[in-house]
From Swiss-Prot:
Pfam families, per database record: UQ_con
Name of the protein described by the UniProt record: NEDD8-conjugating enzyme UBC12
Reactions it catalyzes: [E1 NEDD8-activating enzyme]-S-[NEDD8 protein]-yl-L-cysteine + [E2 NEDD8-conjugating enzyme]-L-cysteine = [E1 NEDD8-activating enzyme]-L-cysteine + [E2 NEDD8-conjugating enzyme]-S-[NEDD8-protein]-yl-L-cysteine
GO MF assignments: ATP binding; NEDD8 conjugating enzyme activity
InterPro entries the record matches: Ub_conjugating_enzyme, UBQ-conjugat_E2_core, UBQ-conjugating_AS, UBQ-conjugating_enzyme/RWD
Residues at the active site: C112
Keyword Metal-binding set for record: no
Record lineage: Eukaryota, Fungi, Dikarya, Ascomycota, Saccharomycotina
GO biological process: protein neddylation
Keywords of this entry: ATP-binding, Nucleotide-binding, Transferase, Ubl conjugation pathway
Pathway involvement of the protein, from the record: Protein modification; protein neddylation
Gene it is expressed from: UBC12
Amino acid sequence: MLKLRALAEAKAKAKEGQGQETTPQVIKPSLIRLKKDLENIDLSEQICEYTTYLDENPMRVNLAIKPDIGYYAGGTYYFNVFIKDTYPMEPPVVKCMHRIYHPNIDIDGNVCLNLLREDWTPALDIQSIIIGILFLFHEPNGRDPLNKDAAKTLIEDPLRFENKVNHSLRGNNIDGVWYDKIIY
């Protein structure tokens, strides 16, 4: 008994010498998955760059998307990707940080991309989202719009749509709405 008491006292003294014991920090599964997704991004910096804010809640990834073809080529478009603790079971929320004239992005920055809604599965990742956004810039979808006026113009008169995109990317007013200057 005396040996046990002596051991307990020695342990207590050793603990006091170390200061307070810290509790181990639990790493969220969503953070582990997000870090893995980011490590696996295999895209050129000429097309996409990103910065992360993993200590925020929800976690955030800022994307700089640079389409190289299509109506929107030549611009850099910034998006915030908000990742909740339920990731990858639920998709991230993606917001465009610019007001742009696009059938699949409304003036509030909401993005209409099927893989962020009904087509989402846990097998998809951040690179899938980046590729999806790039595809929207390469091939805007007039059949599933958030900006119905832009979609109608795209479908009925693609040349007029192109002119409106070019005009809007220079920070001009289209149909009573001012757009952010993307191309200088």
